[in-house]
UniProtKB/Swiss-Prot annotation:
This is Methylated-DNA--protein-cysteine methyltransferase. It comes from Pyrococcus abyssi (strain GE5 / Orsay). Its EC number is 2.1.1.63. The keyword Lipoprotein does not apply. Belongs to the MGMT family. PROSITE patterns: MGMT (PS00374). The gene is ogt. Signal peptide: none annotated. This enzyme catalyzes only one turnover and therefore is not strictly catalytic. According to one definition, an enzyme is a biocatalyst that acts repeatedly and over many reaction cycles. The active site is at residue 142. Keywords: Cytoplasm, DNA damage, DNA repair, Methyltransferase, Transferase. The keyword Plastid does not apply.
Length: 172
């Protein structure tokens, strides 16, 4: 199923769409309106299909967009949001990385790819790949992972990373 909802935060509109079945299968969001959201949704659907995730894209209202928004605003924790994820189609490595990130990097904090890699005994490149493939942005806070040289690398847009961190109270 697909459920989308629009919210206002810090004077901006954020549209959050969630693909769900037994739990959240994927999340996309846009600060730039519906057209950009459609592109992000298409990219997510393609990624989930490649991972063998069975999708129904029938639009139906659900609690999930509001749940994601509540994670963003701090009304509920990332850990609580994580419990709603299906984790379907993820590798064991991705599950390990996402679980660690949710438990260890809190609102208002950032960590480098290298430090995450050291904690998980892997490479910064592997961590970067897992962050890029994250189908659950906001709930799995990939925006809190920054590059040592360029902290603003982020999919879909660097300004989105800055906005999410600002909402969470992070200051450089």
């Amino acid at each position: 199923m697909l459920s989308c909802e629009s919210f206002k935060i810090k004077g901006r509109e954020i549209i959050i769409c969630v693909i769900w079945e037994e739990g959240i299968q994927g999340i996309v969001y846009s600060l730039d309106g519906r057209e950009f959201l459609e592109k992000q949704l298409s990219r997510l659907i393609s990624m989930l299909n490649k991972r063998g995730v069975s999708l129904s894209l029938k639009e139906r209202h659900s609690k999930y967009p509001e749940l994601v928004f509540n994670v963003l605003t701090g009304k509920i924790s990332n850990e609580e949001g994580f419990e709603e994820l299906s984790l379907e189609g993820l590798t064991d490595f991705e599950i390990r990385v996402y679980s660690w990130l949710v438990k260890n990097v809190k609102r208002g904090e950032v960590i480098t790819y290298g430090k995450v890699a050291k904690e998980l005994k892997t490479s910064a490149l592997a961590i970067g790949g897992a962050m890029k493939r994250n189908p659950y942005p906001i709930v799995v806070p990939c925006h809190r992972v920054v590059g040592k040289k360029d902290p603003w690398l982020y999919t879909p847009k660097p300004e989105y990373k800055k906005f999410l961190l600002e909402v969470e109270g992070w200051t450089s």
